[in-house]
Every structure is written in structure tokens, then in C-alpha cells.
Amino acid sequence: MFDAALRGLIDKVKSGSMDRRAFVQRMICIGITPPMATQILAIGGVATAAPPSTYKPTKCGGGGPLKMLWWQGPTLLNPHLATSMKDQDGSRLFYEPLACWDPDGNLQPVLAAEIPSIQNGGLAPDGKSATWKLKPGVKWHDGKPFTADDVVFNWEYAKDPDTAAATTATYRSTTVERIDDLTVRILFSKPTPFWADAFVGAPGAIIPKHLFADYRGNKSLKASNNLSPVGTGPYKFIEFKPGELVRGEINPQYHMTGRPYFDTIEMKGGGDAVSAARAVIQTGEYDFGSNIQVEDDVLLRIEKGSKGKSIRVAGADVEFIALNFTDPNTEADQERSKTKHPLLSDPAVRKAIALLVDRETIKKAIYGRAGNTTANFLNGPEQFVSKNTSWEFSIEKAAKLLDDAGWKPGSDGVREKDGRKFKLLFQSSTNGARQKTQAIIKHACQKAAIDVELKSVVASAFFSSDVANPDTYTRFNADIELLASLSTQPDPERRMRTFHSRYIPSEESKWQGFNIPRYASRDYDAVIDAAEVEIDPVKRAALFVKANDILWQDTVLIPVIHRMRVAACSNTLRPVISSWTTDIDNLHDWYREV
């Protein structure tokens, strides 16, 4: 699994002649990030070291209310059916995974008693299994015990194709077996370099078997508990108004000592990012605002308020434009993925549109401190970032590409070919920064004689997990759309397998696939399949770089801005935010310090 030099370094850490920090620094020098270095140590038999806790409260409760703003409000509270981070966040208020990611990218146990390692017998040396020990005494909010049966059920539920779970990719090639009431073993079909995927982080949160057993498969959307969660988390469910409000109260039987700190919790939806920032930083009406995607000059003015501040976390989030490879207005055999887009199926047309995205203006006019221009979909960790790509803004070159492809300006000034006008429907969620970005791109397209119609959809609807909603980003009833890909773990496998052909959304899959461009490439599929089983970390990183480069070469999408994650926080709140996962994956450690 490891070459001699790497094995020698791991042995030094085991013996105590090299500390963990020195090992991580050596890994950084060869392009391996701290989170991945930690994973290498775990595979090599070195147990995960728990960092010192920064949590100061000494008793459970007494912290009063925690009021949060998610202007993209949750619309569903089942982590397996959540197609967007807002629904993962709403679910994570109540449901928990076996482990979560801390700000440094280290795994921390939640429902697990410990993190698996070779040293504690949890990881197989051949990389083909991981054994989790569960915490004893954990109870669901209705008093039923949490056991290994619940963990096994979540695997069965998610891998069932009729369930159409958004998490199916994580569980489809694994087997989960019950060893005893408090032990489960995950078996991988092949050596698995990144084993900490299943049951980890917000997407790995676990639902109760006794409430969902009758709703596995094609009944998954009929479960009433999709809207009224019964979890194991620090807060118990009180109320849910989809898109508007989620409320919870303290769980006095919570399994972590001295936690939680707050007595009640509220996640308010609606409004926009600007009003959310103001409500935290200027008026102090709320304690925390997530995803503050606000023009930087606006945020600078808001930051003059005295009640709070903005916080920025660097990660791998990217704002990008997806290009539809299928015709949103046509179906073949009731399946859109079998159609070809009349304009965007031509690589020259896709490359021309990419040339019309003025990233530098978008950065300067909108993102400022919160983003940098990029040509890469994969922008971190560093060893996975391609140096082979570049971007350019040129209306002249775009026009020539279109001319050569047969798209000539007509009498009305709009390009046409074979009687078809070059017109694009460009959609995104309702947000000031995104509407400005759309306008900048439309202006350039008009100069290239392309007619662009802009559409904005209320964020709670655009990112909804409601399969009946025709305006979701996964339905993609437009030609191009602007959105973001946000990190949920340090490893890029989950993000990059998004564009594998097996994950194309369809009516059959209840629109749960994340391959929203409907891109199908045997070359790309082969690279991802190889990366999923490559143990050598350097070779594996090279495969993900290659996958990124294929997306760039084929212009499957147009990366625009490598975004920082920005939130608004009251001066007294002490949140624990990690760029490797969702904002509230460490909610149990939040408290207030007056």
C-alpha cells in the first residue's frame, strides 16, 4: 500500500521519534494536504489524535436561544434525499453521522465511540474494510435505542435504486454488516483509499430504522418523517415550515457531556444574503447567517455595524456555469438525457460561451476579498489543483468560433443557423451577486450577437429537493445555469464523481443525480473509476487532476470564481466552522461567550 520511504515515516510516528505535526509538514512539502496526511496515518496504523477542546461551557443548557438565518431555507429534512446543502443543513440540526470533520480536516467521533485505525483494529491493512464501534447508550429523540441495526438500515435504504437517494453513490459499492449491537463493518469491493465517506459528515447523517423501514424504495417520498425528523442530535424537532422556518429545543439526554449549550434553536429561511448579513452584523436580531454571498462593497458597508462580523473560511467551493448537453424542451421516450442540445452539443459553441465569461470583472465588481478567478472545477486541496488549465475573455475569439461553426448574425443582429436563432435561457437562484454575474455575462454575449434571456428562481425553490418542482437546478429546464459546488469533505472523490454518467438525473431517479449537465464520457468515467480504487495518494491525485482537465477540455462547465465560504456571526457567538463540511456539522460545539 505504501512505498518504503512513506512506510518509514509512518513507523517513526508510531514509535514517537517523529511527531504528527512533522509528518504532516513533510506531506505538505510533496503536495499532500493535512486532512489527507491524517488519513494516510490512519491507514498506516496511527490512531487519530484528538485535538484539545475549545468548548468552555461546563453544563448542558442555559444558553438561551440560538437564532440562525439560512436565506436559502430548507424544504426537506431527510439527509438521504437532500440534493442541496441547505437541506443537508436542515437535516443536520437533528440527525447525526458516525463522525464529522473539524476545522483542520480531522475526523471527530459523533455517534462513533472512536475513529477506526489499523492500530485499534478498525481499518484493514488491505484497505478493504472499516469497522466502527458505536457509542453505548445513545437514544433517538423518541427514546428508542440507537444500534448497529440503524446503521445497516441506512446502507440498505440509500443503496436501493428505488429510494432514489442523493447519497446512493456513497453506498452503492459497499456492504455494511452488523457485528453486534454496537459494531458495524463496512466492506469495500476493492481497496479504498478514502474510507471515511459512508456515515461521515452531514451527508452521512443517520435516520432511524424504526421510523423509515416502511418507506424504503419507491415509498421514500411518502414518509411523514421527511418533514418531522426524529434524530439523535443535540436538539429535538419542534416545527418545520418548508422554505421558511425550522425550530428545535434542547435534547436533555444528549450523549455528549456538557452539550448542547443553547436551549432552543431556530433556522429561519427566506429573504436574501444582504438582509441576512444586516440582521446579524447591524441589528443583532440573529446570531448567525450562512452563505453570505454578497457583493464585497455592500458587505464592507454592512461590516461597519457593531453587533457582529463576517467570517471567511478558505476551502474548495467554486461558483460555476453548467452547460446543458441535452435539450430541455424535448424528450425521447420520456427521457431527456437521450436528446442532444441543438446548440450546446457543439464543442465550438461551448468554448465560445466560455470565452464570453469575464471572470476578472466579476471578481472585482462582486466578490472582492471573497473569491479568485479560476479555470478549474476542482480548487482544493492543493495537490488536486490542476496547473494545466487557463481561462481567457475574448469577444473577438468567441465570435470567430461561432462564425466558423456556421452561426452568422442575422438581419436582427442575432446569430442564426439553419433557421434557428442563437438564444439561450440562463437561469440561477435569486441573489444579488448572481444576478450581477448573469448581467455581466449577458452583456458580453450580446456583443457576440447571442440573445440571452435571464431567469432567476427563488433560492428555496431552485435548490429544493421536491421532485415535483420543475425549477430546481437538477431538473435544469434551461440552457445554462449559474450555481456553486460546495465542499462536504476534504477528499475530492464525492465532488468529482458527480459527472460520472451513472449520476445523470432523470425522472426515474426522482431527479436526484448530481450530473446536472447530463454529461456522458467513457474517458471521464474510466478516470473516476480508477481514482476510486487507487491507493497510492500521488497517483490518485493525478487522476483527479486528469478528471478536472477533461471537464475543462470538453467545456462541460465554466468555472468562474473560487469562492471563500462567508458567514455572518454575532460578536458573542463561538461557532465551529470547517471548510471541509457544512456550516453546522459541528453544531454540538457551538456556544456563546459574553
Protein language model annotation of sequence segments:
Residues 2-18, 22, 26, 50-61, ...:
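Extracytoplasmic/periplasmic ligand-capture domains
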Residues 560:
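Active-site-proximal polar cores
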Residues 67, 108, 129-131, 183-185, ...:
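General beta-strand recognition
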Residues 23-48:
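N-terminal export signals
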